[in-house]
């Protein structure tokens, strides 16, 4: 029997609140914290998750849970939504990639097709690519940077406009 455990990150506490209700309804044990959680209580929650294998889910806000903690008890990371700064999502996923991790880690990004999520993901990839180029860790990228940025901004604007139009016809 596999004993997979997961970290679920969202940048919205309202999403985490909904997930809490869903997990409680399903009878799934969980722990979690957000930026509102007392700093002293955070390590207690991390220790509880780490030491109790009957708790399969740790719910965390992306920014509060993305830095300075070791959560190798989990081997799944779910990014429920994306941060506009891809480094915050990268920091969040890195919670599982630490010394002591004994299982392969799987990262899942929830992206809704045809929504602004796709555009945010494209922008995030572009930002990470540029960061790699600046740090010398990536090969030269084909194409005009200004044109790519303009294309992404145009896709985001089109997506927002389509959503506004859809709502106005309802």
Language model regions located:
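ASCE P-loop NTPase motor core, strongest for the SF2 helicase catalytic module
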Residues: 1-170
């Amino acid at each position: 029997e596999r004993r997979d455990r997961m970290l679920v990150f969202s940048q919205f506490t309202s999403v985490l609140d909904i997930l809490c209700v869903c997990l409680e309804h399903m009878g799934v044990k969980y722990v979690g914290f957000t930026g509102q959680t007392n700093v002293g209580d955070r390590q207690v929650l991390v220790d509880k998750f780490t030491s109790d294998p009957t708790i399969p889910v740790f719910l965390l806000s992306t920014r509060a849970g993305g830095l300075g903690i070791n959560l190798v008890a989990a081997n799944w990371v779910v990014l429920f939504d994306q941060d506009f700064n891809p480094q915050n999502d990268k920091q969040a996923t890195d919670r599982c990639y630490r010394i002591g991790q004994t299982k392969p880690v799987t990262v899942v990004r929830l992206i809704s097709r045809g929504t602004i999520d796709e555009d945010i993901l494209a922008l995030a990839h572009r930002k990470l690519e540029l960061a790699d180029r600046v740090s010398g860790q990536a090969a030269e990228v084909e194409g005009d940077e200004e044109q790519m940025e303009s294309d992404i901004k145009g896709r985001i604007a089109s997506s927002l406009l389509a959503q506004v139009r859809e709502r106005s016809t309802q």
